[in-house]
Amino acid sequence: MPKILTFNEDARHALERGVNALADVVKVTIGPRGRNVVIDQSYGAATITNDGVTIARLVELEDPYENLGAQLAKEVATKTNDVAGDGTTTATVLAQAMVRFGLKQVTAGAAPLSLKLGIEAAVEAVSAALLEQAIEVSSRQTIAQVAAISAQDTQVGELIAEAIDKIGKDGVITVEESQTLGLDLELTEGMQFDKGYISPYFVTDADSQEAILEDAYVLLYPGKISALNEILPILEQVVQERKPLLIIAEDIEGEALSTLVVNSIRKTFQVVAVKAPGFGDRRKALLQDIAVLTGGQVVAGEVGLSLDAVTLADLGRARRVVVDKENTTIVDGGGEADAVADRVRQLKAEIETSDSDWDREKLQERLAKLAGGVAVIRVGAATEVELKEKKHRLEDAVSATRAAIEEGIVAGGGAALAHVTSVLDDGLGRTGDELAGVRIVRTALDAPLNWIARNAGLEGAVIVARVKDLAPGHGYNAATGEYTDLIAAGVIDPVKVTRSAVANAASIAALLITTESLVVEKPAVSDGDHGHSHGHGHSHGHSHPQGPGF
């Protein structure tokens, strides 16, 4: 495809127009008095949301140069969402301010690379100052406040706090759509995986259609079991102990399955067979997780074990096992606490080093099954549009809560950023254009508070000046219209969210102000554009709009 190019001021200002177009749409949502944005979609109902990243992802501009700028701003929102799960609107507002002030400096003759160095130094200082101010999140009340601020709903805050209270800080919280109105919290106790019994003949409770085993042995095998003589020795040992048995294997079929079913029907002994969760290497890892949790061994040739040589010492134990048609839940496994803790540490290390989002998600699920539990928040609404909006807010609130637990909290409402500008007052010892770079960040940090105030119908600059005169931790509560101790009032932001917003905004702004040329694909020209005037009052001649610089 042929390309078209533009250079210098034209290029940078085209990018700025694109950043402004996206930021102007997003920033009307910031703060408790922010508005919603309605987005038309090519399929289904329109989306109504105040979630910055959702809005950003759906914005495409017609002008190819300006669209490049919008895509850069979109990257700020998506990267912040990936790292912290919230703060996407704040990040976009910061990026717009940094780009505006940065380009003014470039136009005035400042060296772009020196500005970039100053911006990077300022971000590092701001990040360190925010971490220093951070207050650890430990109480249920604080967790509820973080979630409530993000979702703008105290009921959501209480529900998320209850979930974390019950499943622990490493547990997983998922948000699902419900057919009924309102919010509902369901907690999964112990380890659960999405495989049910192989045969309904294993059911022990006809009413609930569940197989329930008390004080059970657990046999873990990564392959298929079909021959009875392979498992007969261990079955005889389990029968002598008068204990139920859970068999988890890739598959159980043929003679082995029919024998287990017959014994289950005759109540000779209690047994349930289920397929192992996952596939390939992930299946092996999940089986090993279950082995650690139950205190057993995975019966595999790699560790010198074969099915016909298994003893009771190789089996895991569980106080209770509940198996239904679709899921298996192991409650109170008999594994050593130290072994489980070691496995948890190993999984956390793998999560930190993984560079794949999918792998990280699956590792996080495994961690949750071992370390905490799984809480499912089901959300319902009267219409599909409202349901999507509620689900977005819930997902943001869950992410914000996780971020707060990880790094702590600071005052919300844009106050923490307005106060932290004081660490940049001395210019960090920089001079010349690097000092100008520091000042770009210092000025831009006021933008979120400015827009929170403006969305509340107030003069942003006046509110910013007043907040800077207050003590750290104090600021303007736009929900009540009062200047107050924001932390005491529960107006708080996770440090991780705030730091990520600043860092990602600065990263894109620094790249944009050092841009000197743009290269885009030349738009395809339709046949109708080559015609001549047909007397309808519209030009169909050869005059085509050109991008900046042409």
Swiss-Prot record:
Give UniProt keywords alphabetically: ATP-binding, Chaperone, Cytoplasm, Isomerase, Nucleotide-binding
Q: Where in the cell is it found?
A: Cytoplasm
Q: Which family does it belong to?
A: Belongs to the chaperonin (HSP60) family.
Query: Which top-level group of life is the source organism from?
Result: Bacteria
Reported function: Together with its co-chaperonin GroES, plays an essential role in assisting protein folding. The GroEL-GroES system forms a nano-cage that allows encapsulation of the non-native substrate proteins and provides a physical environment optimized to promote and accelerate protein folding.
Q: Could you give the subunit structure recorded for this chain?
A: Forms a cylinder of 14 subunits composed of two heptameric rings stacked back-to-back. Interacts with the co-chaperonin GroES.
Ranges of biased composition (kind: Basic residues): 533-543
Question: Top-level EC class, please?
Answer: isomerase
User: What biological-process terms (Gene Ontology) are attached?
Assistant: protein refolding
Q: What is its main location?
A: cytoplasm
Catalyzed reactions: ATP + H2O + a folded polypeptide = ADP + phosphate + an unfolded polypeptide
One GO cellular component term of this record is: cytoplasm
Stated name of the protein: Chaperonin GroEL 1
Q: Which residues are involved in binding ATP?
A: T29, I30, G31, P32, D86, G87, T88, T89, T90, G413, N477, A478, A479, D493
Q: Which HAMAP family match?
A: CH60
Q: Which parts of the sequence are annotated with region: Disordered?
A: 524-550
- Please report the organism this UniProt entry assigns to the protein: Frankia alni (strain DSM 45986 / CECT 9034 / ACN14a)
Q: What is its EC number?
A: 5.6.1.7
GO MF annotations, alphabetized: ATP binding; ATP-dependent protein folding chaperone; isomerase activity; unfolded protein binding
